Amino acid sequence: RNNPTLGGKSTVYPGQTLNIRYEVSPLGDVYTNGYVYTYVNRDVLRKTLPYLTYLSVFSHGFKEDGSLLPPEGGDEEIISIAKEYGTIPLLTLTSITENGTFSSELVESLLSSPVLTSSVAASLAETAVENGYGGVDLDFEYIPSQYADGYVALINELQTLLPEGYVIFTSLAPKTSAAQSGLLYEGHDYGKIGAASDYVLLMTYEWGYTYGPPLAVAPKPQVRQVIEYALSEIPSSKIFMGIPNYGYDWTLPYVRGESKAQSLSNIEALRLAGEKNAEIMFSETAQTPYFNYFERNSRGGASE
């Protein structure tokens, strides 16, 4: 873990200089978290783990009867590799259905029943301990406003069931005020969730998204507004800021209800710019890079 220059490999050679430990940083402690699918390339995982404090394994789900759904492919190997590097694995529970979409109906079926809520909390705590996790990461989206307190109750109950030393992360929609309307925001009470959780993750990304108009994924002015509001409700020591490492490729002109952007990693974006000989520019407003390119389509025309 103290030698990220090894690139995740465990082989060392005579003459190499290794770091046994670091002196205390004059800047204080830095904590990081990353999300991982169980099918991640293992070499990429090993290269990344030295930089992570926590690793949220994506993801467990649940059915309407409260039974948990394990992540596709299993989590045993991911947990084991994370521990090799001293990274704490987190059991991520989402409100994603078996079809792969976030469901407010699924959330409602859980949080409307105190009995079911207690059952899921108990199953979460038991699974986290048995599987070797070091905590739980809750990622419930599109919570109807009337179940905001029920969500907080789930977090509080989970706190009483997890062993000492385990942590609870809760992901928060990017709100800028307590009164912000919309299904994505109304079920997330920043103050109450911040008090109940050990840490929160601000989802400061996805302003630009697959079906929306061309926008920066995380424009700086909007990100700042979310952080400033979060700081008014939650201690700064509990806040993790979400940072995207991807972008989107839109075909222009954008047509609402029809256009669908393709996601691509930062490296893929750089590669695409090189292939198209596109000039990478910088938006002073969003404080983010972008580029345009032209491509001949199958009908013999050109698209931007």
Regions found by a protein language model. Give the residues of each.
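Extracellular LysM carbohydrate-binding repeats and other cell-envelope/extracellular binding modules
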Residues: N2-D29
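Active-site beta-loop-alpha junctions enriched in small/polar residues
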Residues: T17, Y37-Y39, H60, T94-I96, ...
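Glycan-recognition patch characteristic of GH18 chitinases/ENGases
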Residues: E23-V120
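Hydrophobic faces of well-ordered beta-strands that scaffold small-molecule active sites
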Residues: T32-G34, T53-V57, T87-L93, V136-L138, ...
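Second-shell loop/turn segments in exported
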Residues: L45, E64-P70, L106-P114, F140-A148, ...
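Glycan-binding loop/region signatures in secreted carbohydrate-active enzymes
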Residues: S95-V107, G247-E304
